[in-house]
Amino acid sequence: TWIKVQDYLGQLLAGGEHALLMLDPIPWFEANIPNNAGLYHVEHGDNGLIYIGESSNIKERYDTHSGTTYFSALRRHIGTDVLEFELHVRNGKKRYFAESEDKEINKYLHNCKIKAMKVNFGRFELEEYLIRKYRPLLNRKENK
């Protein structure tokens, strides 16, 4: 059985890609994200697909991305790469934006849509496959 699964890897990844792409994108702040392990895909009106991520709990990750910047790589990349803000040091960590800049990141997210799907097995592989294939603007894992 294990050998058969390995033989079908390409088909499994293509199936996961198809399932994600078939989902309707939901405006960022209107999304009702499932409380499960899974994968999410973020697109922006002007920039198209900007980020693909995975999490053991995509609802919690979505909430993190919707809050302030400290724990959110997506928010940091929007701030530095798109809006060209500088990260500030606080408590010895360079992971903060000014409050006004965090508000600008929220404005950017208002122009984003998200797709999220439950993935119990293979989410790391599917995330890596999709990042390599689509090279989203804000992902850093393209060097995997």
Place the predicted regions along the sequence by residue:
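GIY-YIG nuclease catalytic motif and its immediate N-terminal context
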Residues: 1-60, 64, 90, 95, ...
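Short, intrinsically disordered, mixed-charge
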Residues: 63-68, 80-84, 132-136
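Acidic, metal/cofactor-coordinating or nucleic-acid-engaging core segments within structured domains
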Residues: 69-106, 111
